[in-house]
Amino acid sequence: MKVLVVGSGGREHAICRAVAKSSRVDKIYCAPGNAGIAALAECVPIGAMEFDKLVSFAKDNAIDFTIIGMDDPLVGGIVDEFEKAGLKCFGPRKNAAILEGSKAFSKDLMKKYNIPTAAYENFTDAKEALKYLETAKFPIVLKADGLALGKGVLICNTLEEAKEGVRTIMEDKKFGTAGNTMVVEEFMTGREVSVLSFVDGKTIKIMSSAQDHKRAGDGDTGLNTGGMGNFSPSPFYTDEVDDFCKKYIYQATVDAMAKEGRPFTGVIFFGLMLTEDGPKVLEYNARFGDPEAQVVLPRMKNDIIDVMEACVDGTLDTIDLQFEDNACVCVVLASDGYPVKYEKGFKITGFEKFDGKDDYYCYHAGTKFDADGNIVTNGGRVLGITATGATLKEARAKAYEATEWVQFDNKYMRHDIGKAIDEA
């Protein structure tokens, strides 16, 4: 069969790599792809938001199955467009992708269906938000309602910071229309864990847990980013936590969406906070995380096409989802200055060192070919250096070893990815 993957980051590289392992797939296309994906798929110069062009391409090239990696096209309704054209597409429809597309919607859903989450209020008026904050308890969390590349969450320790946050989100519109509505949420403490799942509208199958590192700097300092590294599984995601989440969060979310007339098909990413009062939902994403996909998919034993087709066909209950009993760590190599301002176009060397090593992998995020055919930096997050091992500590040591194999000017990384492993 022919498969089209839509997106251009490390997550899509991980998806393409999993698809390439499927015995059912003869040909992979990726739109728009990147320099690393080009080794596995034919990259097509169509942007992820160019729905009409993507649908035409899929029809003209007799694509059997399309996989959407990114949040923007899902929230924008790309799956609806593919379905209208009679094409099979993996991901939630627009009316279900709102689970990620609107934080206010997801908070209201959790409240209505008693899914554990932080106390909150939604605001569409900056003055009302400021009035509410006058009497609020600090620290407090402000969230832009819409998509903001994982950067629309502000933790405010004082009223002054909160006022500045309201200005940033609602008045200056730093995150554009994403800030038309703002969620004000109680600040929760505990460990953050990500859990990925496959969903077919009624059945949910949990993949594995992972742990992200969102801040740009060592010691969780600096600005929020799309993610500077990850490890899977999380040692803090115990059987007890799993039992609680299965009982009160996972199926409850799928059932809630179905009851609302918004059946969810695709991947639900649960961002959880393990608090003293038990696990609570921080956020939902309607797709694989990045770099969560890079640490979870290499551990999956199943043929990804079998699983994704079962989601689309509503037969996920027949799939026995299996994962290797191992660990995986990803360290992101970024451009110095990310997530604010950085230079691009630097030549990257050292890829050949990964050749023939099954337990090491270099996922490309912000890369492209220059006019001379060299691979150069083309984004804030450039590469995801990933390694598997029998234990988290082994995988971490191997991933950091491999970060030295690749060189480019302005290379930046965190040196404490997986530090929490030592505290487990």
Predicted regions and their residues:
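ATP-binding N-terminal substructure of ATP-dependent carboxylate-amine bond-forming enzymes
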Residues: 1-94
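Solvent-exposed alpha-helices and their adjacent loops that cap or buttress functional pockets
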Residues: 20-21, 36-38, 60, 90, ...
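Short acidic-hydrophobic, aromatic-tinged amphipathic segments that line or gate anion-handling sites
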Residues: 43-49, 121-125, 156
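A conserved helix-loop-beta module that forms one wall/lid of the active-site cleft
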Residues: 90-152
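Internal nucleotide-binding/catalytic subdomain
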Residues: 152, 156-293
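Active-site "cap" helix and flanking loop/linker of ATP-utilizing ligase/carboxylase catalytic domains
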Residues: 246-268, 285-359, 370
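Generic C-terminus detector
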Residues: 367-372, 376-424
